């Protein structure tokens, strides 16, 4: 009788749990919840792991919608990151329901082979990826301290094995002036909305001088409440992105000058507050990414060639913070979205369609087989364990 390999066993587990995983994906999709408010999604995601015998730690780092569920006691601790927050107004247009379900599928598959491979499987529920930096907060809380390597996937319109992302920071800028009647005594007012306008004009002019890879985008979240009242308070929210964290910091310094210009020109006071932890750029582990690429090909997928991956436009993710700390991957698994891209309503609909269901199942298998390959490679296993020891 032929020997059943660990990879085959893991794949069989995913096939056996297909119905549960797709049901989880659809259930999360049907009840979208925003950052730090994903209570139902968090509970659903950890439930399948708990039923399998995972030891669940609720609310690590004091985050109510985070969790860590562990199985096994091997020295090679593998973190599998689940996301489940949605977007305001358009639900799961980033497909985090697929991410959560594939993370659970990967964890269940690896639990079946954990003892034989010397693994500890750590399913980590990470809230607030869209805004809030849940993974960055969990890193600060020590949740990743014992993790040797971390994996997750993200849906998208194409397959990318070694996905990149942009570094990101987000700030809220509040201008405080003085109210007055806009017709009777406008000269007694200090117009906070004008400060916003000056800042936006300065930012618009700055865009001509931005370095390659730098970009910024923002919204006015408060600008007055009545046309006959000089606005005494106005507020902006801006995101700054760049190819790496150093370039992002340089952009942020220049943006702060634009914000200050609004205050100086109008006489307003101003305050800049970081809206969330900064997101670092993804640094995919090359060995893990190449194994995942081979798994994509084995599944009949056609990943973007390695030599053009860096040129594929992407957003930002707090998984970048994880991959800057330890070996990890964040591949993109393609689904048929009818031409829509993430953060469009068309992608919301696609994220619960047949192609999305296929991504859940195939993604679970590909991630699980990639981890098995790591565990079975003495050289790579030693490498990631040595890197973890160096962090201690």
Where are these regions (language model features)?
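Acidic/His- and Gly-rich active-site-bordering loop/insert found
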Residues: 2-119
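Metal-dependent amide/peptide-bond hydrolase catalytic core
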Residues: 2-5, 197-392
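Short Gly/Pro-enriched turn/cap motifs at secondary-structure boundaries
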Residues: 58-60, 129, 162-165, 311-313
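Histidine/acidic-residue-rich, glycine-tolerant segments that coordinate divalent metal ions
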Residues: 65-68, 85-93, 97-98, 104-106, ...
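Non-cysteine beta-strand/loop elements that form the S-adenosyl-L-methionine
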Residues: 79-81, 176, 330-334
């Amino acid at each position: 009788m032929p020997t059943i390999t660990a990879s085959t066993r893991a794949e069989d587990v995913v096939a056996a749990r297909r119905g549960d995983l797709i049901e989880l994906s659809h259930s999360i999709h049907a009840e979208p919840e925003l950052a730090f408010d994903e209570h139902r999604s968090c509970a659903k995601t950890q439930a399948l792991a708990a039923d399998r015998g995972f030891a669940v730690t609720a609310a690590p780092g004091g985050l109510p919608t985070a969790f860590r569920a562990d199985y096994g006691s091997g020295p090679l601790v593998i973190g599998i990151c689940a996301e489940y927050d949605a977007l305001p107004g358009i639900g799961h247009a980033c497909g985090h329901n697929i991410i959560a379900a594939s993370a659970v599928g990967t964890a269940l598959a690896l639990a079946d082979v954990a003892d034989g491979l010397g693994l500890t499987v750590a399913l980590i529920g990470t809230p607030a990826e869209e805004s809030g930096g849940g993974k960055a907060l969990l890193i600060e809380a020590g949740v990743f301290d014992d993790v040797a390597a971390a994996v997750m996937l993200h849906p998208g319109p194409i397959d990318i094995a070694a996905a990149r992302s942009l570094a990101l920071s987000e700030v809220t800028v509040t201008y405080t002036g003085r109210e007055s009647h806009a017709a009777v005594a406008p000269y007694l007012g200090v117009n906070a909305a004008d400060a916003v306008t000056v800042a936006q004009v300065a930012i618009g002019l700055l865009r001509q001088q931005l370095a390659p890879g730098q970009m910024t985008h923002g919204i006015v979240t408060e600008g007055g409440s009545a046309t006959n009242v000089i606005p005494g308070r106005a507020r902006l929210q801006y995101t700054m992105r760049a190819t790496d964290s150093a370039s992002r910091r340089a952009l942020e310094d220049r943006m702060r000058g634009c914000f200050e210009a609004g205050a100086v020109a109008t006489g307003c006071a101003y305050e800049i507050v970081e809206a969330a932890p900064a997101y670092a750029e993804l640094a995919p582990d090359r060995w893990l990414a190449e194994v995942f690429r081979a798994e994509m090909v084995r599944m009949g997928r056609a990943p973007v060639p390695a030599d053009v991956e860096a040129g594929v436009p992407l957003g930002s993710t707090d998984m970048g913070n994880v991959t800057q700390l330890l070996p990890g991957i964040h591949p993109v698994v393609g689904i048929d979205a009818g031409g829509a891209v993430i953060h469009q309503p068309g992608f919301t609909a696609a994220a619960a369609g047949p192609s999305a269901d296929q991504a859940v199942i195939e993604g679970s298998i590909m991630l699980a087989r990639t981890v098995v390959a790591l565990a079975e490679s003495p050289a790579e296993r030693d490498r990631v364990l040595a890197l973890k020891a160096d962090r201690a």
